[in-house]
A protein has these predicted regions:
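Negatively charged, low-complexity tracts enriched in Asp/Glu with abundant Ser/Thr
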Residues: 1-24, 56-63, 67, 74-75
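Acidic, low-complexity, intrinsically disordered interaction modules
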Residues: 19-64
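A general structural signal for short secondary-structure boundary/capping elements
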Residues: 43, 72-73
């Protein structure tokens, strides 16, 4: 299983769904082997959702972050 492609594909799917809201998720690797998930609105940082995750945790993290955004939008 290619973990890199799995989370990249999931990120792409969620960002397509979020596109109409102006929100998007962005994964950064500030330190080798550790990843952060940022939430952007119209390309501007809204919040750093999570920090210091391993690559094999990113699919769950992306799902949680997308749920976080959708819950916020549903208010």
């Amino acid at each position: 299983m290619n973990t890199h492609n799995d989370w990249k594909n999931l990120l792409s799917i969620f960002n397509e769904d979020l596109e109409k809201t102006g929100y998007s998720l962005f994964i950064v690797e500030p330190e080798e082997g550790f990843y952060d998930c940022e939430i952007l609105k119209n390309g501007e940082l809204v919040e750093t959702y999570a920090e210091n995750y391993y690559e094999d945790e990113l699919s769950d993290l992306i799902t949680d972050a997308a749920h976080h955004v959708l819950t916020y939008l549903a208010r």
